[in-house]
Amino acid sequence: MKQRTLPDFLAPGLDIVSIGINPSLYSVERGFYFARPGNRFWPALNASGLVVPAVAPSRDVIELLFRKYHIGFTDLAKRATPRAAELADADYRRGARVLQKKLVRYAPAIACCLAVR
């Protein structure tokens, strides 16, 4: 059975790669990163001045951020869970190795790790 997750938005030459811990089931169901209403990513992005005009959460906006603003998206662990606390230590170890290879391969100018405790 194929694991449900979100696709990476990675390519050479990105200005920023936003790295989440892992996709939530909510985001996977909706098909885009940071999909949960009230996610702090969107107000922070809009306040940053990186995108003008302000954007609202959607799959199309994720693609716009990738194509127009050279902002990519990936996760430390690709296994979707209701909460990041449900990840096992093995998910983090495996994810760190894979993420390191992605960052070396795509070499973004900035890699931004996003996590909430």
Q: Where do the model's predicted regions map?
A:
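A polyanion-binding, active-site-adjacent surface
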Residues: M1-I110, R117
